[in-house]
Protein backbone atom coordinates (compact mmCIF):
# COMPACT_ATOMS: atom_id res chain seq x y z
CA UNK A 1 0.00 0.00 0.00
CA UNK A 2 1.10 3.54 -0.66
CA UNK A 3 0.81 5.95 2.23
CA UNK A 4 1.41 9.58 1.38
CA UNK A 5 3.63 11.62 3.66
CA UNK A 6 5.55 14.87 3.73
CA UNK A 7 8.72 16.01 5.50
CA UNK A 8 9.47 19.62 6.35
CA UNK A 9 12.65 21.10 7.86
CA UNK A 10 12.25 22.55 11.37
CA UNK A 11 12.66 26.33 11.59
CA UNK A 12 13.13 27.00 15.33
CA UNK A 13 13.46 30.77 14.84
CA UNK A 14 9.98 30.91 13.33
CA UNK A 15 8.37 29.64 16.55
CA UNK A 16 10.70 30.17 19.52
CA UNK A 17 9.71 33.82 20.11
CA UNK A 18 6.09 32.75 20.66
CA UNK A 19 6.96 30.43 23.56
CA UNK A 20 6.10 31.46 27.13
CA UNK A 21 9.39 30.06 28.46
CA UNK A 22 13.02 30.50 27.44
CA UNK A 23 14.97 28.51 30.06
CA UNK A 24 15.07 25.02 28.54
CA UNK A 25 16.81 24.70 25.14
CA UNK A 26 15.78 21.06 24.68
CA UNK A 27 12.12 21.85 25.28
CA UNK A 28 12.30 24.96 23.09
CA UNK A 29 13.39 22.74 20.22
CA UNK A 30 10.78 20.10 21.12
CA UNK A 31 7.94 22.60 21.34
CA UNK A 32 8.94 24.29 18.08
CA UNK A 33 8.85 20.88 16.41
CA UNK A 34 5.40 20.16 17.87
CA UNK A 35 4.11 23.58 16.80
CA UNK A 36 5.49 23.26 13.27
CA UNK A 37 4.08 19.76 12.80
CA UNK A 38 0.61 20.85 13.93
CA UNK A 39 0.70 23.93 11.66
CA UNK A 40 1.91 21.77 8.78
CA UNK A 41 -0.96 19.34 9.35
CA UNK A 42 -3.53 22.13 9.33
CA UNK A 43 -2.56 23.27 5.85
CA UNK A 44 -2.38 19.79 4.31
CA UNK A 45 -5.34 17.99 2.76
CA UNK A 46 -5.60 14.91 4.98
CA UNK A 47 -8.66 13.65 6.86
CA UNK A 48 -6.61 11.71 9.42
CA UNK A 49 -3.24 12.80 10.76
CA UNK A 50 -0.74 10.62 12.59
CA UNK A 51 1.78 12.44 14.74
CA UNK A 52 4.61 10.08 15.65
CA UNK A 53 7.76 10.67 17.67
CA UNK A 54 11.05 9.21 16.52
CA UNK A 55 11.52 6.66 19.32
CA UNK A 56 8.58 4.37 18.49
CA UNK A 57 8.65 1.09 16.60
CA UNK A 58 5.41 -0.20 15.10
CA UNK A 59 4.03 -3.62 14.38
CA UNK A 60 3.62 -4.43 10.70
CA UNK A 61 -0.15 -3.84 10.75
CA UNK A 62 -0.21 -0.80 13.06
CA UNK A 63 -1.45 1.74 10.50
CA UNK A 64 -4.14 -0.61 9.19
CA UNK A 65 -5.28 -1.33 12.76
CA UNK A 66 -5.46 2.36 13.60
CA UNK A 67 -7.30 3.48 10.46
CA UNK A 68 -9.84 0.64 10.56
CA UNK A 69 -10.37 1.02 14.31
CA UNK A 70 -10.71 4.78 13.95
CA UNK A 71 -13.48 4.31 11.41
CA UNK A 72 -15.25 1.77 13.62
CA UNK A 73 -14.99 3.75 16.88
CA UNK A 74 -15.95 7.09 15.37
CA UNK A 75 -19.03 5.39 13.90
CA UNK A 76 -19.89 3.86 17.29
CA UNK A 77 -19.39 7.10 19.21
CA UNK A 78 -20.82 9.24 16.39
CA UNK A 79 -17.91 11.61 16.90
CA UNK A 80 -14.23 12.06 16.17
CA UNK A 81 -11.82 10.22 18.44
CA UNK A 82 -8.07 10.05 19.08
CA UNK A 83 -6.00 6.86 18.94
CA UNK A 84 -2.73 6.35 20.75
CA UNK A 85 -0.91 3.23 19.41
CA UNK A 86 1.05 2.49 22.57
CA UNK A 87 -0.17 0.78 25.73
CA UNK A 88 2.00 2.74 28.17
CA UNK A 89 2.82 1.05 31.48
CA UNK A 90 2.13 4.25 33.42
CA UNK A 91 -1.55 3.99 32.45
CA UNK A 92 -1.79 1.06 34.86
CA UNK A 93 -0.63 3.12 37.85
CA UNK A 94 -4.15 4.39 38.52
CA UNK A 95 -7.32 2.51 39.34
CA UNK A 96 -10.01 4.02 37.13
CA UNK A 97 -13.03 2.99 35.12
CA UNK A 98 -12.63 2.70 31.38
CA UNK A 99 -14.39 1.50 28.23
CA UNK A 100 -13.09 -1.47 26.22
CA UNK A 101 -13.95 -1.68 22.51
CA UNK A 102 -13.13 -4.25 19.87
CA UNK A 103 -11.16 -2.59 17.09
CA UNK A 104 -10.16 -4.02 13.74
CA UNK A 105 -8.16 -6.91 15.26
CA UNK A 106 -7.28 -5.62 18.75
CA UNK A 107 -9.06 -4.59 21.88
CA UNK A 108 -8.74 -0.91 22.70
CA UNK A 109 -9.41 0.84 25.98
CA UNK A 110 -10.32 4.41 26.69
CA UNK A 111 -7.43 6.30 28.29
CA UNK A 112 -7.21 9.73 29.84
CA UNK A 113 -3.53 10.30 29.11
CA UNK A 114 -0.98 9.80 26.36
CA UNK A 115 2.34 11.07 25.17
CA UNK A 116 2.68 12.88 21.81
CA UNK A 117 2.22 9.98 19.40
CA UNK A 118 -1.41 9.69 18.28
CA UNK A 119 -3.81 9.62 15.34
CA UNK A 120 -6.61 12.15 15.07
CA UNK A 121 -8.81 13.83 12.50
CA UNK A 122 -7.98 17.19 11.02
CA UNK A 123 -11.39 18.31 12.33
CA UNK A 124 -10.33 17.50 15.89
CA UNK A 125 -7.04 19.35 15.47
CA UNK A 126 -8.88 22.44 14.18
CA UNK A 127 -11.76 22.31 16.67
CA UNK A 128 -9.48 21.91 19.70
CA UNK A 129 -6.57 23.98 18.43
CA UNK A 130 -6.40 25.95 21.70
CA UNK A 131 -5.35 22.77 23.58
CA UNK A 132 -2.49 22.11 21.16
CA UNK A 133 -1.44 25.75 21.17
CA UNK A 134 -1.42 25.75 24.97
CA UNK A 135 0.76 22.62 24.95
CA UNK A 136 3.45 24.01 22.70
CA UNK A 137 3.50 27.57 24.05
CA UNK A 138 4.16 26.34 27.57
CA UNK A 139 6.36 23.83 29.35
CA UNK A 140 3.98 21.90 31.59
CA UNK A 141 4.82 19.05 33.91
CA UNK A 142 3.68 16.73 32.55
CA UNK A 143 4.22 18.23 29.12
CA UNK A 144 1.07 16.58 27.76
CA UNK A 145 -1.26 18.14 30.37
CA UNK A 146 -3.37 19.93 27.70
CA UNK A 147 -3.83 16.59 25.91
CA UNK A 148 -5.03 15.02 29.14
CA UNK A 149 -7.53 17.86 29.51
CA UNK A 150 -8.64 17.35 25.90
CA UNK A 151 -9.32 13.66 26.55
CA UNK A 152 -12.09 14.76 28.91
CA UNK A 153 -13.89 16.06 25.80
CA UNK A 154 -12.69 13.66 23.07
CA UNK A 155 -12.37 9.90 23.56
CA UNK A 156 -8.80 8.64 23.34
CA UNK A 157 -8.20 4.90 22.93
CA UNK A 158 -5.08 2.77 23.32
CA UNK A 159 -4.69 -0.85 22.07
CA UNK A 160 -4.13 -3.86 24.29
CA UNK A 161 -1.47 -4.97 23.66
CA UNK A 162 0.46 -2.20 21.93
CA UNK A 163 0.83 -1.85 18.20
CA UNK A 164 3.73 0.56 18.73
CA UNK A 165 6.35 0.53 21.44
CA UNK A 166 7.97 3.60 22.90
CA UNK A 167 11.65 2.67 23.15
CA UNK A 168 12.56 4.96 25.99
CA UNK A 169 14.11 4.40 29.39
CA UNK A 170 12.76 0.96 30.25
CA UNK A 171 13.02 1.73 33.96
CA UNK A 172 10.72 4.73 33.72
CA UNK A 173 6.93 4.78 33.92
CA UNK A 174 6.98 5.57 30.19
CA UNK A 175 8.93 2.40 29.50
CA UNK A 176 8.15 -0.65 27.47
CA UNK A 177 4.55 -1.67 26.93
CA UNK A 178 3.30 -4.74 28.79
CA UNK A 179 2.32 -8.02 27.13
CA UNK A 180 4.50 -7.59 24.04
CA UNK A 181 7.84 -9.08 23.04
CA UNK A 182 9.75 -5.83 22.55
CA UNK A 183 12.99 -7.63 21.58
CA UNK A 184 11.23 -9.53 18.79
CA UNK A 185 9.61 -6.34 17.49
CA UNK A 186 12.99 -4.60 17.57
CA UNK A 187 14.62 -7.44 15.62
CA UNK A 188 11.81 -7.49 13.04
CA UNK A 189 12.34 -3.79 12.37
CA UNK A 190 16.12 -3.87 11.83
Residue ranges and their predicted role:
Residues 122-123, 127-190:
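C-terminal catalytic/acceptor-binding lobe
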Residues 54-57:
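The conserved acidic donor/metal-binding loop of glycosyltransferases
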Amino acid sequence: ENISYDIEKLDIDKYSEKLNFKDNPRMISHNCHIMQSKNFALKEDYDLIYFVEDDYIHTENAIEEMVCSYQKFSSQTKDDIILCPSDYPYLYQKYENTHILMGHKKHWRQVGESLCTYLLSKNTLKKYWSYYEDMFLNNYDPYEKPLHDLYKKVFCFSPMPSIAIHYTNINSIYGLSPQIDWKKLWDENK
